[in-house]
Amino acid sequence: MSYSSFKYRDFFGGNTVMVIVPHQDDEINIAGATIYGAIEEGLDVILVYVTNGDYQYKADIRYKEVIKMAKIMHLPLKNIHFLGFPDGYGKEFLSNRESIVTHHAGFSQTHGACNIQDYASKYMGRSLDYTYTNIVLALEDIILRFKPNAIIAVDHDIHVDHKLTSIAVEEAIGIILKKQVTYKPKVLKSFAYDTNFESINDYYDNHLESTVQNRQWIKDKRWSTNNPMLLWADRIRIPVPQACRNTVLIENPIFKALGSHMSQSSYKHGPKLINGDQVFWERRTDNVALHATITATSGDCSKLNDFLRYDVRDVTKNIASSIEYAWIPDTKDNKPTITISFNKPTTIERIDWFENVWFESDELNGLQGVTIKTSNGLEVNVPQYSYPLFEDCPYMKTYVFEHPIVVEWIAMTVTKAKEGIAGISEIEIYSFNESKPTFCHIVANQQFAYDWTIYRRESLPSIYVYYDSMLDKTDMEFSIDGNSIKRDFMMDYIPVMIQHGPVTIRYGNDSIYHEMMMKKGNIIDAISKKCLNLYNKFMYILCKAKYRIGFNLAQKYRYKGF
């Protein structure tokens, strides 16, 4: 049996988590197991839908499906909020951010359904026109109203409404962080498609697999993720609750919750979402540049500290125009310089900056180097990097000072190739990383391990430990059946021990720990696994009939021609 010190309350830094998604079913796609586990632990989960999911279907059916999902996930209806904007209009919202959008059914203001009011009508005293600006306004209002300890939101997926939601959430958070110096929620982003809804179907493998990417759903194959400013290697992995690891497919709450969204036939994607971990990317909110004054020798520098690393206006383009999201110095500026001024002496330790997206074939559009100068006389030259590996990501740069320094200002002078459109989209400056590790988890063959059976013809898995933050490991140790052991010896010892029965492997100390059971499988284990897979496939076929009926019933809510 697997045991862990992991607590959602510790990981999120409090009791309240807000999940913000564009459509009804995306809550399961990006955070299903996390929502279930957090509620099970007693946390308040607040769910926010940006759109009514009403492009093909009337909002009524999508609301009814949410009510069914909430029962499965034990999510109180009072914690669910519908912003009430239209589905499918991300392109229109982003391309002209002040204009009012009109839904094909004639709606042009936020509204609810099924006797449920939209958020603005209920809390802000009026419905809102369908504009991008009002989406940001509503998001800002709901975040400040509840002030969650953590915010989980969708990131730049291939769907236009996902891009819209990601950009609007980040803009709202940027506005809030600039106004509220003390409120710094933990912000986590995730993808709904390549890692979840359209991920790899590995449910029937011998072991519970961790989240993987389906690279076919990455819009540019040279990118690490669908957001060029996020690296796959930088993802945060967290364990999933036992119920969401249920090996009986139709009893797993993730499968059942997806099944409640019958108009979308979401149940079909259930096996892809049931994994041994859930992955997120953290956007730190302790960036001191957000509260600094930034000036530039040329160009519009307002984008440099708005919390948005990658903005898009024309979603029909695979790569956004640099002018849409980055500071671009004038071509005649021979010494383009940004100056970040603080209102008081500030301790800094690290600078991250994010350049406009470019590739090897487009090298003239990349910065050639940066010179950093500080008010205390320090000068550092950061050359253009050479990137032999895809994962190295040439448009994300970091400089870490040898020791924390106290400064009043920082100046960054950039060199760029002539005629190139090179610039910086965001600057993030950090005093020091206050985050502390909240958990560790044993990993076998790169998979989050819970209980592990070594089946016939399988080798002993490679074992290491995952941490959610830098960890002082001086008092952390492995043990087998209660006896301390070094990792190198352990890998030689386990094959001998499992010949005599299951062993319990533990890593950690008294406060942070994880333990799992490992055993050598026999013919009965192999047959049992095959029988379980056959049972799951058979029950899945039976369930399809029920879900088809639900899908057919939902068609009466479908707009004609859609």
Give each language-model segment a name:
Residues 1, 524-562:
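Membrane-proximal basic amphipathic "stem/tether" segments
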Residues 2-4, 11, 92-99, 105, ...:
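C-terminal accessory domains and tails appended to enzymatic cores
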Residues 435-457, 529-531:
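Short, compositionally biased P/S/T/A/G/V-rich stretches that sit at domain boundaries
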Residues 511-523:
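Edge beta-strands of extracellular beta-sandwich domains
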